[in-house]
């Protein structure tokens, strides 16, 4: 799901930069891998990775990749509609809605994704592996699982007021 809308200001945040090496006959070949999260702070967020011999080039590639992989995040006011658990690889992430004014209670990579999505009040817990790429993927996976009350009611074939 790619979005082409340059009118909206998209913010980017570098989550991790890794120095990776490949051992070849002549020695070690050095490159850099970047993990970047982008979002418009208004319900759209994406992440991407890039690899190059120079850090700025790796970041540029990661930003390009992230803009191509943006998702819509359903929100209720300043928080998420319901609690969600997700995992990717060894990383497990728990996201819980929080009351208005609570702020973002999340660490590192999860915080970057949540803030750039525009979610202002949420509590999160990172369980298992703390590898940045897996945490970001688990968080995005969790945000993809979120559904608005209207969607849930439609799936169940009942009205929103009947949801308990």
Swiss-Prot record:
> Which intervals of the chain form a coiled coil?
none
Enumerate the spans annotated as S5 DRBM domain. 10-73
Q: Which domain of life is it from?
A: Bacteria
One GO MF term: structural constituent of ribosome
**Which Gene Ontology CC terms are recorded?**
small ribosomal subunit
Which InterPro entries does this UniProt record tie to the protein? Ribosomal_Su5_D2-typ_SF, Ribosomal_uS5, Ribosomal_uS5_bac-type, Ribosomal_uS5_C, Ribosomal_uS5_N, Ribosomal_uS5_N_CS, Ribsml_uS5_D2-typ_fold_subgr
Pfam families xrefs: Ribosomal_S5, Ribosomal_S5_C
For this entry, list what GO says about its biological process. translation
Keyword terms:
Ribonucleoprotein, Ribosomal protein, RNA-binding, rRNA-binding
What domain notes does the record hold?
The N-terminal domain interacts with the head of the 30S subunit; the C-terminal domain interacts with the body and contacts protein S4. The interaction surface between S4 and S5 is involved in control of translational fidelity.
Assembly, in brief, is: Part of the 30S ribosomal subunit. Contacts proteins S4 and S8.
Its biological purpose = With S4 and S12 plays an important role in translational accuracy. Located at the back of the 30S subunit body where it stabilizes the conformation of the head with respect to the body.
Task: Please state which protein family the record places this protein in.
Answer: Belongs to the universal ribosomal protein uS5 family.
Please identify the protein, giving its name as recorded.
Small ribosomal subunit protein uS5
Q: Which organism is it from?
A: Streptococcus suis (strain 05ZYH33)
């Amino acid at each position: 799901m790619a979005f082409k809308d340059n009118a909206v200001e998209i913010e980017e945040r570098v989550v991790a930069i890794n120095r990776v090496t490949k051992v070849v006959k002549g020695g070690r070949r050095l490159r850099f891998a970047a993990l970047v999260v982008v979002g418009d702070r208004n319900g759209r967020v994406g992440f991407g990775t890039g690899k190059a011999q120079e850090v700025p080039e790796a970041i540029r590639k990661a930003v390009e990749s992230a803009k191509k992989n943006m998702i819509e995040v359903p929100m209720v006011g300043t928080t998420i509609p319901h609690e969600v658990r997700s995992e990717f690889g060894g990383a497990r992430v728990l996201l819980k809605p929080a009351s208005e004014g609570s702020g973002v209670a999340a660490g590192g990579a999860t915080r970057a994704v949540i803030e750039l999505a525009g979610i202002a009040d949420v509590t999160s817990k990172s369980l298992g592996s703390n590898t940045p790429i897996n945490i970001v993927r688990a968080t995005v996976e969790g945000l993809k699982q979120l559904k608005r009350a209207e969607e849930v009611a439609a799936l169940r074939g009942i009205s929103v007021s009947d949801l308990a």
